[in-house]
């Protein structure tokens, strides 16, 4: 394959909360819609996905209620596997060939996480979903998205946000005067302590020259557009 033939390779980060539509568990209508948008771009783009687990468990929040942080994080990781399997099913219904790789071994439902195998799947046109976070406590799925993107040599990390359409200088949900940022460096985002993604993920991308685009999942069509390279939301790089 020549450089001219090389397809764009992206790492898409999806929030778990989006899968539940604000409720506990998985909303089939929402996940089906997300899957159709991803499948539309899969013929032109190599797509890997990291899914959060916030619609089931959030380790940091459970630990604040007295639960051991490590155990709470492992519960969150298992939630991401459930989301990964749900997304796999709806992607395959939409006609996309898909593989799930889990950082925690569970061979009945997913392949183990093997970066070179993931790259081969991508080259063959399969969508790869990474479940179980990093397989280690204290790592957010934002950080895992950055790490996986670097390891599979993605061109960009795309962070799909629920309820916000990019990075702002303050929380637009509480401050109506918050200003949307079209482009900013990783370093400046860290310096300003902007909260759209976690600081460890930003640092990883900054240190390794990985661009990141933060965009809103709505309206319909945004996920497909971002995967295909549309300049929506906020570019960090």
From Swiss-Prot:
Residues passing through the membrane, by range: none
GO terms of molecular function: ATP binding; UMP kinase activity
Enzyme Commission (EC) number: 2.7.4.22
Entry binding sites for ATP: 13-16, 54, 58, 162, 168, 171
Residues that, per the record, bind UMP: 53, 73, 134-141
Disulfide bonds: none
Any Pfam family: AA_kinase
GO cellular component, one term: cytoplasm
Broadest EC class assigned to this enzyme: transferase
Pathway: Pyrimidine metabolism; CTP biosynthesis via de novo pathway; UDP from UMP (UMPK route): step 1/1
Principal cellular location given in the protein's record: cytoplasm
UniProt keyword annotation of Cell membrane present: no
Activity regulation note: Inhibited by UTP.
InterPro entries: AceGlu_kinase-like_sf, Asp/Glu/Uridylate_kinase, Uridylate_kinase, Uridylate_kinase_bac
Entry's localization field: Cytoplasm
UniProt subunit comment: Homohexamer.
Family the entry assigns: Belongs to the UMP kinase family.
Functional summary from the UniProt entry: Catalyzes the reversible phosphorylation of UMP to UDP.
Matches recorded under PANTHER family: URIDYLATE KINASE, URIDYLATE KINASE PUMPKIN, CHLOROPLASTIC
Protein name, as recorded: Uridylate kinase
Native source species: Leifsonia xyli subsp. xyli (strain CTCB07)
Gene behind this protein: pyrH
């Amino acid at each position: 394959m020549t450089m001219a033939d090389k397809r764009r390779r992206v790492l898409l980060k999806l929030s778990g909360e989006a899968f539940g539509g604000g409720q506990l568990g998985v909303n089939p209508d929402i996940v089906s819609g997300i899957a159709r948008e991803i499948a539309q771009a899969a013929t032109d783009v190599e797509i890997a996905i990291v899914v959060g687990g916030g619609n089931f468990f959030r380790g940091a929040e459970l630990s604040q209620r007295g639960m051991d942080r490590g155990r709470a994080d492992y519960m969150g990781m298992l939630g991401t596997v459930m989301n990964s399997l749900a997304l796999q099913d709806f992607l395959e219904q939409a006609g996309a060939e898909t593989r799930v790789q889990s950082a925690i071994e569970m061979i009945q439902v997913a392949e183990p996480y093997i970066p070179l195998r993931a790259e081969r799947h991508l080259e063959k046109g399969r969508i790869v979903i990474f479940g179980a976070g990093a397989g280690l406590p204290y790592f957010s799925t934002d950080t895992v998205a950055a790490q996986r993107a670097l390891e599979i040599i993605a061109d960009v990390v795309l962070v799909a946000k629920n309820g916000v359409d990019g990075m702002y200088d303050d929380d637009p949900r509480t401050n109506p005067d918050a200003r949307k940022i079209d482009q900013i460096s990783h370093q400046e985002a860290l310096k300003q302590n902007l909260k759209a993604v976690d600081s460890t993920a930003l640092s990883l991308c900054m240190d390794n020259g990985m661009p990141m685009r933060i965009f809103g999942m709505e309206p319909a069509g945004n996920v497909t557009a971002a995967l295909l390279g549309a300049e929506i939301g906020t570019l960090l790089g």
